[in-house]
Every structure is written in structure tokens, then in C-alpha cells.
């Protein structure tokens, strides 16, 4: 018993979906699902960009803080 990999199982599922939603409604559902997936992927990419920008800002802050600390050490040595 091959689980759900059998073509007859998929045919039965397809038949049930057509009976539940009707042949005209299925393309609309698929279109809505596709738009939802695209929006999700776009937001995931946007989230990655925000994370990269945040990381760059943190690196710049650390570099600035290290430079400021080095400058204050130099001032104390000269004094």
C-alpha cells in the first residue's frame, strides 16, 4: 500500500475537490493561492533585506564605538 503516491488516490482527491468547489471556482482558488504564496515570498525577501540592513547598522555602530574608544585612549595617553 503505497500511501498517497498512487495515481488513483490523487484522482479521487481531484474528483472530490471538483465536486466541492465546482470547475469554475477552482481556477479562482488557485489564482488566490498563487497570489498568497507570492506575497509571502516577497515579504520573506523583504525581511531578509531588513535583517541585512540592521546587521550593517550594528557593524557601523561597533566600528564607530571602537574608533571613539581608541581616540579616548589616545587622549589619555597624551595627557
From Swiss-Prot:
<comment type="similarity">
    <text>Belongs to the TatA/E family.</text>
</comment>
<feature type="region of interest" description="Disordered">
    <location>
        <begin position="52"/>
        <end position="79"/>
    </location>
</feature>
<keyword id="KW-1003">Cell membrane</keyword>
<feature type="compositionally biased region" description="Basic and acidic residues">
    <location>
        <begin position="52"/>
        <end position="61"/>
    </location>
</feature>
<dbReference type="InterPro" id="IPR006312">
    <property type="entry name" value="TatA/E"/>
</dbReference>
<keyword id="KW-0472">Membrane</keyword>
<keyword id="KW-0813">Transport</keyword>
<dbReference type="GO" id="GO:0008320">
    <property type="term" value="F:protein transmembrane transporter activity"/>
</dbReference>
<keyword id="KW-0811">Translocation</keyword>
<feature type="transmembrane region" description="Helical">
    <location>
        <begin position="1"/>
        <end position="21"/>
    </location>
</feature>
<keyword id="KW-1133">Transmembrane helix</keyword>
<keyword id="KW-0812">Transmembrane</keyword>
<dbReference type="GO" id="GO:0043953">
    <property type="term" value="P:protein transport by the Tat complex"/>
</dbReference>
<keyword id="KW-0997">Cell inner membrane</keyword>
<protein>
    <recommendedName>
        <fullName>Sec-independent protein translocase protein TatA</fullName>
    </recommendedName>
</protein>
<dbReference type="Pfam" id="PF02416">
    <property type="entry name" value="TatA_B_E"/>
</dbReference>
<comment type="function">
    <text>Part of the twin-arginine translocation (Tat) system that transports large folded proteins containing a characteristic twin-arginine motif in their signal peptide across membranes. TatA could form the protein-conducting channel of the Tat system.</text>
</comment>
<keyword id="KW-0653">Protein transport</keyword>
<comment type="subunit">
    <text>The Tat system comprises two distinct complexes: a TatABC complex, containing multiple copies of TatA, TatB and TatC subunits, and a separate TatA complex, containing only TatA subunits. Substrates initially bind to the TatABC complex, which probably triggers association of the separate TatA complex to form the active translocon.</text>
</comment>
<dbReference type="InterPro" id="IPR003369">
    <property type="entry name" value="TatA/B/E"/>
</dbReference>
<dbReference type="GO" id="GO:0033281">
    <property type="term" value="C:TAT protein transport complex"/>
</dbReference>
Amino acid at each position: 500500500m503505497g500511501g498517497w503516491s498512487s495515481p488513483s488516490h490523487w484522482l479521487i482527491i481531484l474528483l472530490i475537490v471538483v465536486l466541492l468547489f465546482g470547475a469554475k471556482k477552482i481556477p479562482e482558488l488557485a489564482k488566490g493561492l498563487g497570489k498568497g504564496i507570492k506575497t509571502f515570498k516577497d515579504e520573506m525577501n523583504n525581511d531578509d533585506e531588513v535583517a541585512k540592513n540592521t546587521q550593517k547598522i550594528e557593524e557601523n555602530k561597533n566600528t564607530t564605538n571602537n574608533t571613539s574608544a581608541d581616540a579616548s585612549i589616545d587622549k589619555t595617553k597624551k595627557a
